[in-house]
Swiss-Prot record:
The keyword Oxidoreductase does not apply. InterPro entries: Ig-like_dom (IPR007110), Ig-like_dom_sf (IPR036179), Ig-like_fold (IPR013783), Ig_V-set (IPR013106), IgHV (IPR050199). SMART domains: IGv. Residues 50-54 are annotated as: Complementarity-determining-1. One of its GO terms (biological process) is immunoglobulin mediated immune response. It comes from Mus musculus (Mouse). Residues 86-117 are annotated as: Framework-3. Residues 1-19 form the signal peptide. Keywords: Adaptive immunity, Disulfide bond, Immunity, Immunoglobulin, Signal. This is Ig heavy chain V region 7-39. One of its GO terms (cellular component) is extracellular region. Residues 20-49 are annotated as: Framework-1. One of its GO terms (molecular function) is antigen binding. It comes from the Eukaryota.
Amino acid sequence: MNFGLSLIFLVLILKGVQCEVKWVESGGGSVKPGGSLKLSCEASGFTFSNYGMSWVRQTPEKRLEWVASISGGVSYTYYPDSVKGRFTISRDNAKNNLYLQMNSLTSEDTALYYCAR
């Protein structure tokens, strides 16, 4: 029996920010438990490096969960216990890119993933 995870990646702009955001799906839409995926979000229309950025997700039950945050500038990172040690948020200010590396994926990680400012 295949216990693959169905992961869908979306990008959400919060606070009425006027910018274009591209989303990139990486690694396909289905991953086996224990697998890895990297999400990427490219932003424009604001000074990316000045803002903290986050990843959030919406579960199949429609719950919103915070996944990770990274500060602007020095880039401090923050995670809930549910993903700490498995997920890594990072940013490339020169390219206006936000990333989420997800390792050791489980069925609990099945969700819609959103990039947010």
